Amino acid sequence: MKPVMPHAQLDWDDQGRPRSRVFDDVYFSDQSGLDETRYVFLEQNRLAERFAALSAGGRLVIGETGFGTGLNFLCAWQLFEQHAVAGARLHFVSVEKFPLSPADLQRALALWPDLKRFSDQLLKHYVAIHQGFQRIVLDNGRITLTLLIGDALEQLPQLDGQIDAWFLDGFAPAKNPEMWTAELFAELARLAAPGSTISTFTSTGWVRRLLNAAGFKMKRTPGIGHKWEILRGEFLGWPEGVAPPAAAKPWFARPTRLTGDRRALVIGAGLAGCATAASLAARGWQVSLLERHDAVAQEASGNPQGVLYLKLSAHGTALSQLIVSGFGYTRRVLETLQRGTDWDDCGVLQLAFNEKERERQAQLASAFPEDLLQWLDQPEAQARAGVGLAHGGLYYPEGGWVHPPALCQAQSAQPGVTLLPHQEAVELRKVGDQWQAFDGERLIATAPVVVLAGAAEIKRFAQSGELPLKRIRGQITRLAQTAQSQALATVVCAEGYVAPARWGEHTLGASFDFSSDDLTPTTAEHLGNLAMLEEISTDLVARLHVSERDAESLQGRAAFRCTSPDYLPMVGPLADREAFTRIYAALSKDARQVPDMPCPWLDGLYVNSGHGSRGLITAPLSGELLAAWLDNEPLPLPRSVAEACHPNRFALRRLIRGK
């Protein structure tokens, strides 16, 4: 049976207020939802004074069960703006099984004109909200909202972070008992920071007792409106006699957070480097972005058009989860760029060009909801594309194309990022607590933190030389549009892809060459790209007058993709390879034992590389992931996915498997 995106099913009363059909309960008080939110959640957690106490560079993390209409989040944001100093940040993490559709959210939030300035920003970025972790960055990075879409007991155990204040705001315990269980409260305790506070609108005795048993000290306090009493409390610590949650494996544990000088060098100004620089700068870091060329996006990130295409698995793999979360994040980032020139959400159609592909697509169509992907038969696909097609396929309505240099330029132009062109680092040395980057014997930059984001070129550094990255040459072809080719309405993919024209040119590609190191475009690969276009649409070939074009004069460009053996990127802190092998040598004899030894981190050295042909999907969110590792923030991905992307995974496999 085709899954349906579990959007909230709502009824609306005569005053325009939403009510859940599933739980037969209201989203907020019939009297004054704003007053109740401010009293129950903001006042009981003492947020006004805690926001005021934050220093520049400080942050407070709020966790919530039940995002609903976002009312609590918006009220917290409004209060934060009123009391927090410039440079302080608010991070809000909320789990929601049944998210409102964008239209319903807009309708619900229209009830609160007092919050319009904040709700307008949320609504602008409330796009591509799909299952799993979905990060939304607001107010130029001052506000971070991480939505965990799905069942709370599936999503919260994957969250890695520390929560300073909890809002318990699911539907009433009698209506939705699954949100008020000992198992869930144990997750709240696991995630609670020392001294974390908690509040909820209910005063039910068994809820209070379960929270107390989880390590919170709860007490009843006078309520508001028709609520006679409510609960508030604080986290005292993991209860005695209960086994504490297992710590992260040392090779995946968080490095000690660096204090003091918040300067970073990012080496490489492609998609990964620019995303990393932007994410760090949003957190108050001063970032020097080193680039060997004269501008950003001059290598693999320099193609005129790249495709926002989700190559998914029906089996919920780490890569598939990363792609869904990364796709959503990239789509939201693109909302700040110019549609039509920098990007376009024209949709992406993946043709079922053979039986194997058709079977794969059938599995995906049964595993994912229609707002993410939908099966179109041949007539429907042809109508959607605007050109003749021989096959149906999967349509991704939120997909499209992106001009990668525009994204890189926007991210590198963020306050706090300084681009240093014509600077090619070839060696790193650690002196005291500073990393030094050299281009030979000349020192070009120093900082306590370095992020290697130069694709496979990072193998030139001794500290990262054994990372198993490989280069794959790819070439794209540019074709001037014709009056007839303007009919192409969406990106169409088979073995290759073709995009609707940008600035009068279609982009098609891309070749895969595993052996060549020469980046000079070749006629043979242009002809190969034209052959892939023929497989996509003979009608489009005719519309583009391909037979009349001189193959020798075709224009395009070639670059190297950078990929890893498991096709996941490498994002996170780097360890000393020799020390790692020595400390964890016992794993080669028994992989089940975990030596009680801290990982030998190369303090301050990180990597963001290996994005392959998925950089538009994975690199922007990987910038957030890297910044979260560095600043000890809640991770923007499930812990298991972050570990699957960790650079240490390869050293670990070599120890365990002997290869």
UniProtKB/Swiss-Prot annotation:
Keywords: Cytoplasm, FAD, Flavoprotein, Methyltransferase, Multifunctional enzyme, Oxidoreductase, S-adenosyl-L-methionine, Transferase, tRNA processing. It catalyses: 5-aminomethyl-2-thiouridine(34) in tRNA + S-adenosyl-L-methionine = 5-methylaminomethyl-2-thiouridine(34) in tRNA + S-adenosyl-L-homocysteine + H(+). InterPro entries: FAD-dep_OxRdtase, FAD/NAD-bd_sf, MnmC-like_methylTransf, SAM-dependent_MTases_sf, tRNA_MAMT_biosynth_bifunc_MnmC, tRNA_MNMC2, tRNA_S-uridine_synth_MnmC_C. GO terms for biological process: methylation; tRNA wobble uridine modification. Its cofactor is FAD. Its EC number is 2.1.1.61, 1.5.-.-. Catalyzes the last two steps in the biosynthesis of 5-methylaminomethyl-2-thiouridine (mnm(5)s(2)U) at the wobble position (U34) in tRNA. Catalyzes the FAD-dependent demodification of cmnm(5)s(2)U34 to nm(5)s(2)U34, followed by the transfer of a methyl group from S-adenosyl-L-methionine to nm(5)s(2)U34, to form mnm(5)s(2)U34. HAMAP family: MnmC (MF_01102). This is tRNA 5-methylaminomethyl-2-thiouridine biosynthesis bifunctional protein MnmC.
